[in-house]
Amino acid sequence: FTDLKFRVVLSPRSSKKIYEKGIESIPSESVCYPAKLSHGHIESLIEKGIKYIFYPSVAYERKENVTQGNHYNCPVVTSYPEVIRNNVDNLETNEIIFRNPFMDLSNRKTMFTNLKDEFKSFGISDKELKAAIEHAYEELQQCRLDIQGEGETVLAYLKENNMTGVVLSGRPYHVDPEINHGLADLITGEGMAVLTEDSVCHLDKELEELRVVDQWTYHSRMYHAASFVSSQPNLQLIQLTSFGCGLDAVTADQVAEILNARNKIYTLIKIDEGSNLGAIRIRIRSLKATIDKQENKEIDLSKKYKPVKVPFTKEMKDDRWTILCPQMSPIHFQFVEKAMQESGYNLKVLPSVDKGATEAGLKYVNNDACYPSI
């Protein structure tokens, strides 16, 4: 934007006051705290007199390693600009130009096409726009390299001084002090260094396969960070999740499995707008005490994480093994059973969900999982 001669104005740092500014337009109490905060940030920009707000819907991140099946953003990150557009009345009242184009950070051609359409009223030439996009990607890459370099510097310091480090693993917005409530300070206060998952995930060379589908860029960072931590005797991992995040119900179980393969401690901390850290402080001190007890314990590097999957073989198909299919949509699934049977699979769609099915599901599914999973 600076290259294109725009004056860039950012909203203030997140705070409880910012959160309260937007509380009236939040449509769902169950959405995560970072999403709730965005309402306050938009209201803050409106109060500053900003007449043009750019809040893109980023559906795809960049693919950061070859093991990823895809590179989506979470549905909330992808679609929340639409929620803002339809719920923040002050955008219309103050005649704000609100732009939220859907963008794919992994495809520079579509980035150019979308931004050209977005900025056509500003008279920006194709040459100027292409140069600005290239510069932006260069800055993004340099930022990634800077973070990775800092991570490697901290790791070298820990090894040299025989210290313990904690990888505070989460999503990019968990770096926001208002969202993490100063959790990193609690950890350093116990004499341990803090690293982020994206400062070490590039160092993992072991993780090849997962139990879950690896199609989210930020999830992939967590998995590779966990794999790297599992191979380092002086590192531990704490996963940070926001209340209401259904996707992290998946990552929490997978990260725990990766760490447990080498008997590493898995610590999960859930946070929301509440800033009382008493219980969290106790958990960190307990982690520190456990680490001290295991100080001289060696890691068996021969124990690599291998997901347990049940294959469906051609022999099973030929022997007419039954495939049970949960009822997800009565309108569509009435055709699924017949279509699969015509294709040679003995598939049975389960009956519609009742109270008993829900209660049974709750016994086996992560508490944060969405209702269809249960």
Q: Which residue stretches match the model-derived regions?
A:
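An N-terminal assembly and electron-transfer interface module characteristic of large anaerobic redox
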Residues: 2-374
